[in-house]
Swiss-Prot record:
Pfam family, one: zf-TRAF_2
Induction text: Up-regulated in denervated muscles (at protein level), with highest expression levels around 14 days following denervation. Negatively regulated by the bone morphogenetic protein (BMP) pathway.
Native source species: Mus musculus (Mouse)
Zn finger region (TRAF-type): 49-110
Record's compositionally biased regions (Polar residues): 256-266
Region spans: Disordered: 222-241, 247-266
Post-translation changes: Auto-ubiquitinated.
Keyword tags: Metal-binding, Phosphoprotein, Ubl conjugation, Ubl conjugation pathway, Zinc, Zinc-finger
Gene it is expressed from: Fbxo30
Domain F-box: 611-659
Subunit organization: Part of a SCF (SKP1-cullin-F-box) protein ligase complex. Interacts with SKP1, CUL1 and RBX1/ROC1.
Basic and acidic residues bias: start-end ranges: 225-241
Pathway membership: Protein modification; protein ubiquitination
Protein name: F-box only protein 30
Length: 746
């Protein structure tokens, strides 16, 4: 046995089909032919090597690791890949839609009224895109409770200060002057804290020596005042939770937690480090009602004297100047060098995080590393704060009396609900929330900065359903009956999913072209066998999608006023067949015409019209019949009965496709890896290829306009003079020419 397996010295280099060398032990062996009759002749010791090259040798498919169960001859592998069930292609075609404007909202509500009764391709695709958008769109909580808030775990490194604790008197108490440059915050308790901070700044500019002695009492008074205000604000928030009516935003800036902020001055420059810590009751800061993550903001001064014309001080970080001029070490927060060298806010990319030492929320003595998103520091309006501002122009502004107000829409002096947005449905509210954070969209409220010191806060000018504001679930769950009970009664009837909030017209923008952020982008994302992908892309995206704007589906010209009539101008080459859209499969399909000759026997049947003759056929016959159907039809047939489901299931390997579902497996050591959880077999949604399109045998749109209820003819019998003809008779009496009469009189 070993002699047959081992390579002989002669056989290693012999490639002749007519080798005449006699077999000798250890030197050569006999010539044999391929057992699969591929025509190859070789020495018997090379049989295993030939099996690696034989074209007739049966091997597993190249996609066996992706779920293909077939084994076939090696020369059939390339041909099999075109129809391999594991050779799946994902369609990445994209299209875009604009949200419905406020002026067109009424007309789109009338268009969505009879969507279940009348099958319209453009409306079906638009509603499908809207359902996909709402299923993936998560509405942020506007009224978050402390019990519902789940704080994200973060690693904290406790750092004890070895220096004796001294009150923070190294400079001025920092004020959050730039946080609203990226995100506006609306709370009630912030205005009083800001006033207290401004008083400290005012007193510091007048007499820097008196600041050290008076800051102890001021900090204690601020703590007592903040505790009192937070208790009152908590009662107000509890009352707001009970009220499920209309909700409006209140302008303001959250400066809570200013006692925990730190500032260091060195060589006349100031470094402000602001921390948006949560309030005392455990809830996070609110931005126009939305919860915000903690972020840190730094302002660097470049050799600027913060105190105007006063003498330049030599206060260093961590030093405190006493009344006699001596300095003592302080336990104030040390700003790391990596934070001081931050690039300008305009150059920061999105989602740029950095670990920064900041005081702990529970104990100010401890320092912990907090993860800060530096991308949040960018201004939404495109004009970010300078990271090295000059405070010379603020030298006299501290002496000007200032007043902070929390305003609402009562002083706008406009009619109540001027745009007719009272009681908007959940779909409109969800899209409005999604566009509110977009600079290109129409925000619910906005803030504008005139300079570093003056900020104009936007306020919410209309009410929104409480179901949107008081929940933190997906929009699809919000639109359920349980969520609608908390909202206005009219929101549940009609169903919010039937009200179209997206434009019917598709906008095709290439990936490399910039898009408006208020435009929604949709991806096909359907899976097909490799041989089905070309026909899907040509028929669905090239023919149907391109013809929905008036060629494939032609709407009445008066659709803007509410007419829902439409007609199919094009049909497949087979006369009578039509394009349909299945809401459950989320795909288009071709419905062939049924000949009247085939319908007559069923009418004359004794058993009635509902008799099922197809199920009485043998299983093999049903398999043969189902083999002629496309994937879209097989998906429909599998939903008819258990028998038809078994028939379609027997065709999965030859007509279906296999998809891998991955799952994350965790090991006892703590690490994890992704492994194949299961292999799912199903049919694709591809329909038979349509090579030619023809005009359907239908009436003209002009015939519909004759009977259209919206085509109301308004006859103008009374003459209406032009502006220049108001004094025609008087001018003509004077004998002036007609040309001078027609000229406008100025």
């Amino acid at each position: 046995m070993e002699e047959e397996v081992q390579q002989h010295s002669h056989c290693m280099n012999c490639v002749s089909r007519r080798c005449m060398t006699r077999p000798e032990p250890g030197v050569s062996c006999d010539l044999i032919g391929c057992p699969l009759v591929c025509g190859a002749v070789f020495h018997s010791c090379k049989a295993d090597e030939h099996r690696l090259l034989c074209p007739f040798e049966r091997v597993a498919c190249l996609n066996r690791n992706f779920g293909c169960p077939f084994t076939l001859a090696r020369n059939k592998v390339a041909e099999h890949l075109e129809m391999c069930p594991a050779s799946v292609v994902c369609c990445t075609m994209e299209w875009n839609r604009w949200p419905v404007s406020y002026s067109d909202r009424k007309s789109y509500e009338s268009l969505s009224r009879d969507v279940d009764e009348v099958a319209q391709l453009d409306m079906a695709l638009a509603l499908q895109d809207q359902r996909m958008l709402l299923e993936s769109l998560k509405v942020a909580t506007m009224m978050s409770k402390a019990t519902d808030k789940i704080s994200e775990p973060r690693e904290q490194i406790s750092v004890k200060s070895s220096v004796q604790e001294i009150p923070r008197t190294n400079g001025l108490v920092s004020v959050d002057e730039e946080s609203y440059g990226a995100l506006y915050q609306a709370t009630v308790e912030t205005t009083r804290s800001l006033a207290a901070a401004l008083d400290i700044l005012n007193s510091a500019t007048r007499d820097i020596g008196m600041l050290n002695t008076s800051l102890h009492a001021t900090a204690n008074e601020m703590d007592e005042e903040n505790n009192k205000e937070s208790f009152q604000d908590k009662n107000l928030k509890d009352q707001d939770h009970l009220d499920e009516g209309e909700i409006g935003a209140v302008g303001g800036v959250d400066y809570s937690g200013t006692s925990q902020n730190a500032q260091a001055e060195q060589n006349g420059s100031s470094d402000l480090l602001c921390d948006l810590n949560p309030s005392s009751n455990g809830t996070s800061a609110l931005c126009n009602g939305f919860p915000l993550e903690k972020m840190c903001i730094q302002v660097k001064g470049q050799d600027q004297n913060f105190h105007g014309d006063s003498t330049e001080s030599n206060i260093t970080n961590g030093d405190c100047v006493e009344a006699d001029g001596t300095s003592e070490p302080s336990s104030s927060l040390v700003v790391p060098e990596q934070l001081r060298e931050i690039s300008p806010f305009s150059a920061l990319p999105d989602s740029t995080f950095q670990q920064i030492l900041m005081p702990d929320e529970d104990d100010e003595k401890d320092l912990c590393w907090k993860k800060v998103d530096l991308g949040d520091l960018k201004d939404v309006n495109g004009s970010p704060f300078s990271h090295a501002p000059s405070f010379k122009f603020l030298s006299n502004s501290w002496y000007i009396p200032k007043e902070d107000k929390a305003v609402d829409t009562s002083d706008l002096e406009v009619a109540e609900d001027p745009m007719g947005l009272q009681g908007i449905d959940l779909i409109t509210a969800a899209l409005l929330f999604c566009l509110g954070d977009s600079p290109g969209g129409r925000g619910i409220s906005d803030s504008r900065m005139t300079d570093v010191y003056h900020v104009d806060f936007g306020t919410q000018t209309f009410s929104l359903p409480s179901a949107i504001l008081a929940t933190n679930t997906m929009v699809g769950e919000i639109a359920s009956a349980s969520a609608c009970d908390h909202a206005n009664p009219q929101l549940s009837n009609p169903s919010p999913f039937q009200t179209l909030g997206l434009d019917l017209v598709l906008e095709c923008v290439a990936r490399y072209q910039p898009k408006q952020r208020s435009m929604f982008t949709f991806v096909c994302g359907q899976l097909f066998r490799r041989k089905e992908f070309s026909s899907h892309f040509k028929n669905v995206h090239g023919d149907i999608h391109a013809g929905l704007n008036g060629w494939m589906e032609q709407r009445c010209p008066l659709a803007y006023y509410g007419c829902t009539y439409s007609q199919r101008r094009f049909c497949p080459s087979t006369q009578g067949a039509k394009i349909i859209h299945d809401r459950h499969l989320r795909s288009f399909g071709v419905q062939p015409c049924v000949s009247t000759v085939l319908e007559e026997p069923s009418r004359n049947c004794v058993l009635g019209l509902r008799s099922d003759h197809l199920s009485s056929l043998p299983f093999e016959v049903l398999q043969h019949i189902a083999g002629f159907l496309d994937g879209f039809s097989l998906c429909q047939l599998a939903c008819v009965s258990r028998l038809m489901r078994d028939v379609c299931g027997s065709l999965l390997q030859s007509r279906g496709m296999v998809i891998l579902q991955w799952g994350k497996k965790k090991y006892p050591e703590g690490n994890s890896s992704w492994q194949i959880k299961e292999k799912v077999w199903r049919f694709s949604t591809a329909f038979c290829s349509v090579n030619d399109w023809k005009f359907a045998d239908i009436l003209s749109m002009a015939d519909h306009l004759k009977n259209c209820s919206y085509n109301v003819i308004e006859k103008r019998e009374e003459a209406i003079p032009l502006p220049c003809m108001c004094v025609t008779r008087e001018l003509t009496k004077e004998g002036r020419s007609l040309r001078s009469v027609l000229k406008p009189v100025l």
